[in-house]
Amino acid sequence: MLKVVGMKEINAIFEVTDRLGINREWIEIPLSPESPGVVRKLPNGKYEIVVDAGVPIEQWAAAMETELKKLL
């Protein structure tokens, strides 16, 4: 189980958000993962991406992309 979000997870998130054309300044990634992970649009227009602590990042990134597309 993931305890802290590291560069591997952040790079996987940015790979997806870059592909979707979302500016990195509009992404908030808490360094504490949770289970389940969460993708939501905040009232200020930014996207909060909370990494899922119990799912490998490669698998979770695909689910995250699906959720982000719903919010665009």
How would you describe each model-predicted region?
Residues 40-53, 69:
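Short, charge-rich amphipathic interface segments used for partner binding and complex assembly
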Residues 1-2, 43-46, 63:
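Short, structured interface segments that constitute the first stable element of a domain
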